[in-house]
């Protein structure tokens, strides 16, 4: 009667593997001078001390954890007078291990620099990290081009509007929570109550844009695509 128990053990291990594979690591780059600790690692939102972050940044971290990643590494960006110091921020994250990256604090120009960075990391160093950025048609498997705007969500019982840049943290957390048996396509985003809907979802998807759609009942990821189109 030992064989069934062996099968059960294999099953348990398989379930454990799927659970582990579904829990990737997200790196969030945030502009925040509330505290001085640069690199902060959390395994659940309860680990985060609210007073260590601005209210907006705490909400961004909270949104990320909605996707159930294994860990969220929050890095305080090195700033300069007119934004962040991209080169120094890249040095900060260079040796950190993560699967998904989001940086709501980036300008479009800074986002383009990070898109180029992640693309080159993928090509030259074969690193697996991918970036979720807004309005970055990078044509790269290492960059997700998030392209939905006017996002309204229910958060802590209130309806609020979220900038697409801030919502990249939610998308990164969701992507980190997709296991090897699943796809991010049609993943439901239960907190959303309104968006600016795409006029032509098929064209947007073909153009390498990750968008949110409304199917008449639920808001969900249209298709889990990167910005790669060639």
What name fits each language-model region?
Residues 1-152:
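Small-residue-rich
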Residues 88-230:
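A glycine- and small-residue-enriched flexible loop/hinge signal that marks low-structured segments
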């Amino acid at each position: 009667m030992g064989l069934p128990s062996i099968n059960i053990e294999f099953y348990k291990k398989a379930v454990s593997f799927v659970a582990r594979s579904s829990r990737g690591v997200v790196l969030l780059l945030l502009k925040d001078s509330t505290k001085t600790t640069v690199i902060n690692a959390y395994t659940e939102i309860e680990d985060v001390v609210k007073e260590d972050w601005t209210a907006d940044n705490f909400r961004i971290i909270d949104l990320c954890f909605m996707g159930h990643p294994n860990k969220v590494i929050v890095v305080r960006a090195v700033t300069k007078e007119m934004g962040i110091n991209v080169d120094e921020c890249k040095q900060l994250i260079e040796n950190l291990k993560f699967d998904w990256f989001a940086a709501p604090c980036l300008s479009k120009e800074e986002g383009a620099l990070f898109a180029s960075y992640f693309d080159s990391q993928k090509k030259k160093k074969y690193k697996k990290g991918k970036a979720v950025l807004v309005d970055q048609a990078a044509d790269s498997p290492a960059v997700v081009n998030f392209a939905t705007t006017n996002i309204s969500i229910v958060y802590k019982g209130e309806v609020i509007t979220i900038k697409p840049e801030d919502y990249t943290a939610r998308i990164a957390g969701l992507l980190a929570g997709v296991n090897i048996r699943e796809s991010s396509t049609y993943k439901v985003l239960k907190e959303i109550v309104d968006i600016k809907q795409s006029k032509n979802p098929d064209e947007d998807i073909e153009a390498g844009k990750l968008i949110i759609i409304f199917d008449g009942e639920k808001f969900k990821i249209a298709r889990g695509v990167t910005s790669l189109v060639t």
